[in-house]
Amino acid sequence: MIRHFLRDDDLSPTEQAEVLQLAAELKREPFSRRPLDGPRGVAVIFDKNSTRTRFSFEMGIAQLGGHAVVVDGRSTQLGREETLPDTAKVLSRFVDAIVWRTFGQDRLQAMASTATVPVVNALSDEFHPCQVLADLQTITERRGSLKGLRLSYFGDGANNMAHSLMLGGVTAGMHVTIAAPDGFHPDPSVVGAAEQRAETTGASVRLTADAHVAAAGADVLVTDTWTSMGQEDDGLDRVKPFRPFQVNEQLLAAADSEVVVLHCLPAHRGDEITDQVMDGPASAVWDEAENRLHAQKALLVWLLERGR
């Protein structure tokens, strides 16, 4: 049966654990799985600029024995002279999977509605599930079991990382806190979905406007840019409300002594995170970036093996 990965709760807790275990295996033995030998192809479409997503998917697909057909979405007929469902039918005849970094989540859903190969969300305005798989792999490397850990996110609670951390974190059995200024809290429908999943895993979701409450005793501190792609024009207006949510040495001191600090990058040093924290011993940012490669390879292997 064809499976898609459009948002973090598309994987059950057991399935998420399987992907993370496979990611660890592929990090140890990068060329041990070759499901794309042939070479077989994967469409990798970018409607938004990318560094880590492009490099990690291109290299990962090559290590799996395949060929990445990388396309700028603006140079195709996607959603313009051809409908997304029609495009999905066509691409499904050419490639073994479709990886898409785009805008609205509805575009991914339209693509997946008729695709006969797996569709993977490489980032949308609402979710960033591949990044959170890499985050969970990184936390596992530093702290062991994920279940019961306290993860706190600081910044724009309405952005894709906050949404995905809630869904992915509670799927892993973590207690997730979103610390954001008033007016920047997560989509209530995503909070509801996370709470529903949390009921099955013993996890919890908490929203707060107090960064120090969120940091107290936390095992993981996560932040992201205060201004997401497409919001650059109002970047200066965001500095004042977000300044109390900067991940700095004061917040770090309130957290657990073995706290792990994550940032999906690119980082605006001195805004959402200080140099001292980002370059300090608690930071796992560079391992986190590398793990995009391993987590995404594992996801592709998992999806492809279930679709055959």
UniProtKB/Swiss-Prot annotation:
A cellular component term, taken from the record's GO annotations: cytoplasm
Cited PROSITE patterns: CARBAMOYLTRANSFERASE (PS00097)
Main location: cytoplasm
Keywords: Amino-acid biosynthesis, Arginine biosynthesis, Cytoplasm, Transferase
GO biological process entries: arginine biosynthetic process via ornithine; citrulline biosynthetic process; L-arginine biosynthetic process
Binding site for L-ornithine: 160, 224, 228-229
Organism domain of life: Bacteria
Xref: SUPFAM superfamilies: Aspartate/ornithine carbamoyltransferase
Gene3D superfamilies xrefs: Aspartate/ornithine carbamoyltransferase
Record's subcellular location: Cytoplasm
Residues involved in carbamoyl phosphate binding: 50-53, 77, 101, 128-131, 264-265, 292
GO-annotated molecular function: amino acid binding; ornithine carbamoyltransferase activity
Covalent S-S links between cysteines: none
Reaction equations catalysed: carbamoyl phosphate + L-ornithine = L-citrulline + phosphate + H(+)
UniProt entry tagged with the keyword Transferase: yes
Pathway annotation: Amino-acid biosynthesis; L-arginine biosynthesis; L-arginine from L-ornithine and carbamoyl phosphate: step 1/3
EC numbers on record: 2.1.3.3
Similarity remark: Belongs to the aspartate/ornithine carbamoyltransferase superfamily. OTCase family.
Purpose: Reversibly catalyzes the transfer of the carbamoyl group from carbamoyl phosphate (CP) to the N(epsilon) atom of ornithine (ORN) to produce L-citrulline.
HAMAP family given in the database record: OTCase
Name under which the protein is recorded: Ornithine carbamoyltransferase
Organism: Mycobacterium ulcerans (strain Agy99)
Encoding gene per record: argF
